[in-house]
Amino acid sequence: MKITKTDGPPKDVLYFDEEYKDDELDLSPQDVEDVAEIFKTPLTGSYNWDYTVADNRIKKLYELGKELNWNGSIDLDWDYNHPKDEPLTGIEGVTLPHEELDAWKNLTDEEKIEFDRHETAEVLSQFLHGEQGALLVASQIVSCAPTFNAKMYAASQTFDEARHVEVFNRYLQEKVGFHYPINPNLKAVLDKILTDERWDLKFIGMQIIIEGLALAAFTNMKLSANDTLLKTLLHYVIRDEARHVTFGINYLEDFVQTLSPEEIEERAQFAYEACVISRDRLINTKAMSKYLKMTDEEVRDFQLSNGAMDQFRSFLFSRVMPNLKKIGLLTDSVRPKYEALGILEYEHAPSDFEIDWAEITKPLESSDQVKAESDEMLSEILKAQEAANS
């Protein structure tokens, strides 16, 4: 075993050699090098000595987590290989803003497919890095959450996050062949959450902000995925994430009521700052910069100036704002700040507090069922957009 310690994450795209995709390749510990970046956190743990199991929604969510566990190695069809001459993502009849640029039109068909793979890989890589962050935070919450129910659920979530890291990593290595480094803004928000000493701020940052945004981003990619394996993988991950977000809202709604007004304001400000960083995180620049011959700053300006990014950002924060309101963190002091970001209007969207038990307890769907459900959802969204634009 070789462990190399670094002062920060890698900055270059990591390519995986074809030989390492051979299932029969037997790697010894001496053949593997782990690259580790050290972070320090003043974590304060707690025992719970009464082992009280409250008969409530959190207990039910914990039981569901055990019942609905899935195995990333056998429940996904890893034998499926998407045709290399077809894009991994894209919606028929929908033109993306960058496809109007001369730089994209001048690409050959092969280059357009290659660009699609790199752009998809850049987004999926952020999913992978974010899930590792969620894995680390969930493991911290096991130690420092004060109640027995919260510790038990965080333990089950830790295993969920490990499974998500596993499947995203495997897809990128085996089906794409490379992954991108972490977006600096995503790294900033993960650092902010992981190194804070207060367990409930970790909880707010991860369960409400990061997981809420991830749930929306995963859904967006699932709807546009052409790769059957990728679409099904995302669907299974979304099922888990929906439970995680619901757990966070149900637990925090009660907990926030135990805090003083000053403590609530402090946490409301923390959530706002996490949203600001996460809003910038949505802009990935590397693939577009490489293939469309733009600087990172030009890509950022282009992304911020087109309506598609505003629409995508709205979709993301429509999952976060109502949840912040539900747990009591849309205070009078931060509301104008969210208004300035242009996302306060989503406070009235449906929150994830109410649980559709019939939906959340369904057995794992087949790939065909996932595709049919995804196509139906996409059709409804496109019809709504068409009606809004008419």
Q: Where are the model-predicted features located?
A:
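Terminal targeting/low-complexity segments that flank the catalytic cores of oxidoreductases
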Residues: M1-S139, S143-K151, E174-P181, N185, ...
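Short alpha-helical scaffolding segments that buttress acidic/His motifs in well-ordered protein cores
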Residues: V123-L124, A154, I204, L234
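Alpha-helical transition-metal enzyme core signature, strongest for iron centers
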Residues: F127-L135, Q157-L172, Q207-F218, V237-G248, ...
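A generic secondary-structure signal for well-formed alpha-helical elements
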Residues: A145, A162-V165, N169-H179, L229, ...
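Short, well-structured alpha-helical segments
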Residues: K151, A155-T158, K231, H235
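Active-site-adjacent scaffolding segments
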Residues: V165-K222
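Aromatic-anchored, glycine/proline-accented short structural segments
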Residues: A217-I277
